[in-house]
């Protein structure tokens, strides 16, 4: 009996329609999981597994630009109205961008999408997680976090410098893992396990998409990096594998890894918490 068969339930996956998120969705659908997909764009139209799951309602789709608080709030409200429970939450949406970009709220896009939004989704779906059996959150981080040499939480919203992959992207992933570490004891007291995990190097190149990868990395990725199912497996194991009872840990290659700049974890958590309580709470209000 596989892990999935033992723990079959309902998983919510952000960024479920491409790359690692798509492979995680396909893996879990094949094992009989119910999947809630929170995505910005559509699934591939030629994927028979996905199409069949949509028709049978094993896969239920909610669409929003996650970096737009008004759209995100609307989608999360719909999920809370329509869904009964969430056993596993995979905060997986994100990516590396080719330049400094900003969200509708005015913050740097890597930080908004990959640090702030996972916190918002986790907070907003706590009630559904409490109704689930597994009550587990996995935040998709990156080993790029370990390359950060200087870290200042005050510059995350409006960085003054940009470097592909190793700049705001890496800082946003480090910040994600830091607040995950800091929040974990509070959630564990409520019965919810949260941890962050690096899905490893995967060939996630998409034709026609301008990525934030350094030019030299693209041919290396194409030739040598494994299929995104590799990363999906690592995220799956982060939720259900041997570390499933450990709150707050950061996993690289399924190994617990010490975070750099852990002294800033409370400050990062305070920042994302303030954005959630002040800005997100007011999103979508008239006047």
Language model segments and positions:
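A glycine-rich helix->loop->beta "capping" turn
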Residues: 58-59, 77-91, 97-102, 133
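C-terminal helical subdomain
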Residues: 218-259, 266, 274, 278
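Conserved glycine-rich Rossmann-like NAD(P)H-binding loop of the short-chain dehydrogenase/reductase
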Residues: 31-47
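N-terminal Rossmann-fold NAD(P) dinucleotide-binding loop
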Residues: 21-22
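Rossmann-fold cofactor-recognition segment
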Residues: 53-70
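Conserved glycine-rich cofactor-binding loop
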Residues: 17-18
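Catalytic loop of short-chain dehydrogenase/reductase
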Residues: 94, 98-102, 108, 130, ...
